[in-house]
C-alpha cells in the first residue's frame, strides 16, 4: 500500500486550466444554482473538462443517502426537498453553455418514495426539449433494483444509461454502501437492455482499491455478459483520509493492457487510464460507438 504522505507518480499530475472557459462554466453553474459531481466528488478531471466546456450535472440535491467508502459526496439519512424547477434550470444552463453532450448524474435518494426516478426523468426530458440536438447521458443510481422506476428513466429517452459497479465483486461489500450490491448493479444494467434493447449502456471500475488482476478481468466478463456496451477503467484517488485507502497506483501500461483485453471481449468502447471516469470525454465515447456501428 502506498505511503499516503509520499508524492504521487508523475502520471497523476493534474494540469490547470489554460483558458477562460473554466471560469465561464463555473459562473453558469452558480447562476443557475446547480450541483456538479465534478465539485462534489472532487473529480481530478474538473479543470480539464470545464476548460473544455464539459461537465456532469448532479441532480436530486447534494446529500446522498448512501455512504460508499470511496466517495466524498456529502451523505446523510435524508436529502433536501426536491426542487421542481431544477429540470428547467439544468436545461437552461446546458443551453447557455451550448452543450452538445449533456451528462447527468445524481445522489441516491432512498428517502423518497420513488427514489428520485421521476425527478431524474424530468431532468432528461427538459434537456431534450430545450436542446433537441443534444445527446444526454444518464449516470443512474440503482433505484433499489425496481424495474418500474428504471423504466421511467429509460422512457425519458437518454442516449446512454450508465450505472457503475465501481469495484470487483469481493471488495463491493466493504467499499460500497451496504444497500448497494455488485450483482444488483449487474441486474440494473441487464434490465436497461430488457426495457430497451437498443439503449447504449456503460459501467465503470475504479482500480487501486485492493483488487487482483484476475478479479478485474472477471468483472469485465460479468459486464460483457450483462450486455454492457461501454466500459471505463480509472485510478482510484483517495479524496481524504476519511475514505478508503489507495492500495496501489496502476501504471499507464497496465491500463492499456486492460483496455485491449476489454476490447477482445467485444465491448463497443473501452476507455482506460489513470484519470478516466464514467463521464470523462463521454461525448467522444458516444461518437466513436455510433461511428463504428454505422461502419459495421
Swiss-Prot record:
> What domain of life does the UniProt record list for this protein's source?
Archaea
Q: Which reaction does it catalyse?
A: [[Fe-S] cluster scaffold protein carrying a second [4Fe-4S](2+) cluster] + N(6)-octanoyl-L-lysyl-[protein] + 2 oxidized [2Fe-2S]-[ferredoxin] + 2 S-adenosyl-L-methionine + 4 H(+) = [[Fe-S] cluster scaffold protein] + N(6)-[(R)-dihydrolipoyl]-L-lysyl-[protein] + 4 Fe(3+) + 2 hydrogen sulfide + 2 5'-deoxyadenosine + 2 L-methionine + 2 reduced [2Fe-2S]-[ferredoxin]
Classification via Pfam families = Radical_SAM
Record key words, sorted: 4Fe-4S, Cytoplasm, Iron, Iron-sulfur, Metal-binding, S-adenosyl-L-methionine, Transferase
Q: Where is the Radical SAM core domain?
A: 50-268
Cofactor names from the entry are:
[4Fe-4S] cluster
Co-factor note (free text): Binds 2 [4Fe-4S] clusters per subunit. One cluster is coordinated with 3 cysteines and an exchangeable S-adenosyl-L-methionine.
Asked if the Swiss-Prot or TrEMBL record annotates the protein with the keyword Transferase, the reply is yes
* Keyword Heme appears in the UniProt entry: no
Q: Where is it located? A: Cytoplasm
Residues given in the record as [4Fe-4S] cluster 1 binding sites: 38, 43, 49, 279
GO-annotated cellular components = cytoplasm
Which Enzyme Commission numbers does its entry carry? 2.8.1.8
Per UniProt, where does [4Fe-4S] cluster 2 bind? Answer: 64, 68, 71
PANTHER family associated with the record: LIPOYL SYNTHASE (PTHR10949), LIPOYL SYNTHASE, MITOCHONDRIAL (PTHR10949:SF0)
Q: Which family does it belong to?
A: Belongs to the radical SAM superfamily. Lipoyl synthase family.
Name used for this protein in its record: Lipoyl synthase
Originating species: Methanocella arvoryzae (strain DSM 22066 / NBRC 105507 / MRE50)
